[in-house]
């Protein structure tokens, strides 16, 4: 058996974390890693104590026909990146890497996944250095967070997701 490379190893863990997700549209799993230690994990789901969409059987954004990338304030879920960030001390996130995996409701990999504008802001402020996103079974893209700072998509009409 061939040993799994480290990036896909961490992406596999993020994919397992994603299985806890409770969104009816898409679920994501995030892990934050620094110096080969997992600092925090997060998945898509309602805030603690609130009912999840899978328990309610409906998605408000879907019932209102809101397209992907718009009106996230109407969503019941906290995004996986946000869940992971709020569960970790900032000093442990500075210079860390986020590993992100997303799947749609049919269980297909979201190949063009990216963090939303709010999560990008949180990632920047947390001091995270890189975001690695699974694009296929063994493939991924690497984003240097500094690129999000230098190429501020909030100043254009490009939403980035």
Task: Report the location of each language-model feature.
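Zinc-dependent deaminase catalytic domain
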Residues: 1-161
């Amino acid at each position: 058996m061939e040993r799994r490379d480290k990036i896909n190893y961490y992406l596999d863990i993020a994919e397992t974390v994603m299985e806890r997700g409770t969104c009816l549209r898409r679920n994501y799993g995030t892990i934050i890693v620094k110096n080969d230690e997992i600092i925090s994990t997060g998945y898509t789901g309602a805030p603690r104590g609130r009912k999840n969409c899978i328990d309610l059987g409906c998605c408000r954004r879907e019932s209102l026909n809101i397209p992907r990338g718009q009106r996230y304030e109407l969503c019941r879920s906290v995004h996986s990146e946000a869940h992971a960030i709020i569960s970790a001390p900032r000093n442990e996130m500075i210079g860390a890497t986020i590993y992100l995996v997303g799947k749609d409701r049919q269980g297909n990999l979201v190949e063009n996944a990216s963090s939303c504008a709010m999560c990008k802001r949180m990632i920047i402020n947390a001091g995270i250095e890189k975001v690695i996103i699974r694009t296929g079974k063994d493939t991924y893209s690497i984003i240097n967070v500094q690129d999000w700072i230098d190429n501020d998509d909030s100043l254009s009409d490009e939403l980035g997701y």
